[in-house]
Amino acid sequence: MVNKKQQILRINKLIIFLLIFSFCGGGSETSETVEEAQDTTTTTEAQDTTTTTEAQDTTTTTEAQDTTTTTEAQDTSTFVSWANVKGPPMIYAASDVSQSTIDKTLKWYEIASSAWGEFGPAEIWIVGNSKETVSDLEDLWCDIRTEKDKKWNKEWDCANEYWSPFARYVDDGGAAVSTYYRDYIDYHFFLVTMGPKYPSPDEDDYKVVTMHEYFHIYQHAHISNIDDEGPSSAIRDEKMGGADKPWFAEGGAEYMAQLLYSRQPNVRSNYLKEIMDRKAYSIGEYLDYGKPLKDLTYSDPVQTYDIGTWLVAYIVDKVGEETFRVNFYKDLDGLGFEESFKKHFGMGSDQLISEFDEWIKQPVDELLKIIP
């Protein structure tokens, strides 16, 4: 059994190694050529992640300036996002997470950020398979949070008997993005949590999931309303397609991630059609269920992610990738969800979904004709 101090030290060594790696890495792995300009902030300041050293069971942090530059053309006409810090993310991993998993996570995160623009600050926390190492990761989380933000509430926002930021990922795997853009803290950031149990880092799905989560960062970075657990939060939810309504946010993240992955070197040419064919199995249950797509929640017994992915594929086929990813999100904050939807997709969301619901009744072979 490795004692607590040794485990934290192992975590810290991974952080230091990865920080060095992130400076040496970059977008050279990215093969996608996107015709449209990228919708990013114009801020040139880039603050990198922290290196961590152990001292009496606490962590100390020193900042290093990142000199990485993005070679892709950037859209300088977008509003100045709150998430305007460029540079590689901070990565923290449990001591039982392999270096290859850390490297793979960073690689596919950077492929996505190179294609869609850099937004941050962001932190990636990779959970392992052991409750013991997760406990140490939770301790590190609290140390980092309280060091970066004096307003951080240790009693409620560090791991306790009622809540943990990472524990469920040990058994369930998965991934998520949390937006810490809140009125009761001073340091605002994105939290990307990766649970490598499902999908495994050895699977192609892990690469896609990493990019899927980055697209959620892209989405949230285009919304200026702060989370105040009140009116501003409600507006923020509305701009994501509705509170607890995954149809647009998840559909967009999934389709854009799958599309980007399909363009990478050595990915089979029919990959995207195969994925969308698989997702088409959910169409029948959606049509039979009878509940409007916009009203489906995460708890409904319908694969809303799959239907949302097909909806976004349908939108992209109608108006183009640039209109969906760049123009819609550029106007989202100022116009609101529905008005930006009408402006760029030619009709309101209810009308477009009604049209889509008729379209997906066709044989799957016909549907797949819109997939590149």
Model-derived regions, located:
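N-terminal secretory signal peptides that target proteins for export/translocation
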Residues: 1-9
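Extracellular mucin-like PTS domains
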Residues: 33, 39-72
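Zn2+-dependent metallopeptidase catalytic core
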Residues: 93-178, 207, 211-214, 221, ...
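Zinc-dependent metallopeptidase catalytic helix centered on the HExxH motif
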Residues: 169-275
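Beta/coil-rich, acidic/histidine-enriched accessory regions frequently appended to metallopeptidases
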Residues: 76, 103, 107, 333-372
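Active-site-proximal alpha-helical
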Residues: 112, 252, 256-260, 273-350, ...
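C-terminal motif of bacterial Sec signal peptides marking the signal peptidase cleavage site
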Residues: 22-23
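Acidic/histidine-rich, surface-exposed loop or edge segments in extracytoplasmic proteins
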Residues: 80-99, 194
